[in-house]
UniProtKB/Swiss-Prot annotation:
It comes from Staphylococcus epidermidis (strain ATCC 35984 / DSM 28319 / BCRC 17069 / CCUG 31568 / BM 3577 / RP62A). The gene is putP. This is Sodium/proline symporter. It catalyses: L-proline(in) + Na(+)(in) = L-proline(out) + Na(+)(out). One of its GO terms (molecular function) is sodium ion binding. Its main location: membrane.
Length: 511
């Protein structure tokens, strides 16, 4: 019987090639960070949004890489390995959600954020869209971003720590710090341009990795007959419905609802050169996502047979990709595949750090400093943005220092928080002329509160009744939709010019 350490020791301990690949990967990221620093950090819009000059292909892979994170390479394969094919309902929901997002949200958001005061953050857009002169919605939505993204970012650091602990035998905390130092460097100095370029680069690496590992695993095992072997081990392994419930399927499928309100994803739509380039971005982005998720499912399924055949004791299912990549491949290739995991983790961390930083700077600091001074203090705002990156990273690292949950659960909680608070509001903002400031604030707060209450007090009751175990985005999203609608209907309608802006957006998008 092998332990995880035994399975990896012969592959890594004496193979400097693996380390070389990781070091080369880190050097490339640092170079891109320096390039971003030289090219586009002169003002806050450039630092936070790339000056709205990003092309469709970088937009597509940047959105995909920052979306999928370590979850696609570590979380999803581990889930499929543990529960079988029934885990793929989440991938169906996510793919549909992402596809609809490109059609429903992307074009209007790109146009509307520019028309509505050239907003560079989601809270700033809400404020301008609803003519909130008191900045109440800007402050509340900014707080939601800071709280949930700190939680979300810490899940990425947990993934990085786990990677170095599992693959290299390093102390978890040492691995966490290595990832933190690199990602903070290129985000701190390079801003949005560096983050987008590194995301594109990392997205390519991730895709290659997710295609390579399951194909080589099949060749090493029993070809297509491997799936017959997997079914023989446990009938539920290849059954979409067995081993789960209707409520479980609905919960997994409902992850797709979160796409419309994820700031680190939809900010990509805000930064593209023109809304007319979004179809190109959509075709590449959805294709990348579909192939990557299929690969992750393939890793999980082939891993069932692979681990069993080699009598490996897999202590943590989320390390499945690491184990397979290091046993199946030459150390040089293994190093590349480990870099793919780092790519998945770091692309998301950098995006989340930047969005949180932009919220702290644009939605809080500039508010305190005084918007009338904004044009003459761009360097100051960029500096505050950089310091905010550092501050959020330190807080997230502190929380991640003592991990006590799985990557999937950590991501799930934050995803639900944004999905319930922002998804309905984004959709209402882009399509409904009767949305009011009071309705928006009430619905947003209600969605976030329901998610927090459900996670903290309702979900633990699932042992009594399975209904309480449903994914928290469902009740949060429903409550947010209803509260926003009801309160908007009961309060004063928006001014005419707000409605005129909405009509202008519709006209521009149709051109």
């Amino acid at each position: 019987m092998f332990t995880l350490g035994t399975a990896l020791s012969n592959q890594i301990d004496a193979n400097w090639q693996t380390y070389v690949m990781i070091i080369v990967y880190f050097i490339i990221l640092l170079i891109i960070g320096f390039y971003g620093y030289r090219q586009a950090t002169g003002n806050l819009s450039e630092f936070m949004l790339g000056g709205r000059s990003i092309g469709p292909y970088i937009t597509a892979l940047s959105a995909g890489a920052s979306d999928m994170s370590g979850w696609m390479i570590m979380g999803l394969p581990g889930s499929v390995y543990s529960t079988g094919l029934s885990a793929i309902w989440i991938t169906i929901g996510l793919t549909l959600g992402a596809y609809i997002n490109y059609f429903v949200v992307a074009p209007r958001l790109r146009v509307y954020t520019e028309i509505a005061g050239d907003a560079i953050t989601l809270p700033d857009f809400f404020k301008n869209r609803l003519d909130d002169k008191k900045n109440i919605i800007k402050i509340i939505s900014g707080l939601i971003i800071v709280v949930f993204f700190t939680l979300y970012t810490h899940s990425g650091f947990v993934s990085g720590g786990k990677l170095f602990e599992s693959a290299f035998g390093l102390n978890y905390h040492a691995g966490l710090l290595i990832v933190a130092i690199i990602v903070i460097f290129y985000t701190f100095f390079g801003g949005y341009l560096a983050v987008s370029i590194t995301d594109f680069f990392q997205g390519v690496i991730m895709l290659i990795a997710m295609v390579m590992v399951p194909i080589v695993a099949l060749l090493k095992l029993n070809g297509w007959d491997t799936f017959h072997d997997i079914a023989q081990m446990k009938p539920t392994n290849l059954d979409l419905f067995r081993g789960t419930t209707v409520l479980g399927i609905v919960s997994l499928f409902s992850w797709g609802l979160g796409y419309f309100g994820q700031p680190h994803i939809i900010v990509r739509f805000m930064s593209i050169k023109s809304h007319k380039l979004l179809p190109k971005a959509r075709r590449l982005g959805i294709s990348w996502m579909a192939v990557g998720l299929l690969g992750a499912i393939g890793v999980g399924l082939t891993g069932i047979s692979f681990i069993s055949e080699r009598h490996i004791k897999l202590e943590d299912p989320e390390t499945l990709f690491i184990v397979m990549s290091q046993i199946l491949f030459h150390p040089l290739v293994g190093g590349f595949l480990l870099a793919a995991i780092l790519a998945a983790i770091m692309s998301t961390i950098s995006s989340q750090l930047l969005v949180t930083s932009s919220s702290l700077t644009e939605d809080f600091y500039k508010l305190i400093r005084g918007s009338d001074k904004a044009s003459s203090h761009q360097k100051e705002f960029v500096l505050i943005g950089r310091l905010s990156v550092l501050l959020v990273a330190i807080v997230a690292i502190t929380i991640a220092w003592h991990p006590n949950d799985t990557i999937l659960n950590l991501v799930g909680n934050a995803w639900a928080g944004f999905g319930a608070a922002f998804s309905p509001l984004v959709l209402y903002s882009l399509y409904w002329k009767d949305l009011t400031r009071a309705g928006a604030i009430s619905g947003m707060v209600a969605g976030a509160v329901v998610v927090i209450v459900w996670i903290s007090w309702i979900k633990p009751l699932a042992t009594i009744n399975a209904f309480f175990g449903m994914y928290e985005i469902i009740p949060g999203f429903i409550v947010s939709v209803l509260i926003t609608y009801i309160v908007s209907k009961l309060t004063k309608k928006p001014d005419d010019y707000v409605i005129e802006n909405l009509n202008k957006v519709k006209h521009v998008v149709k051109e």
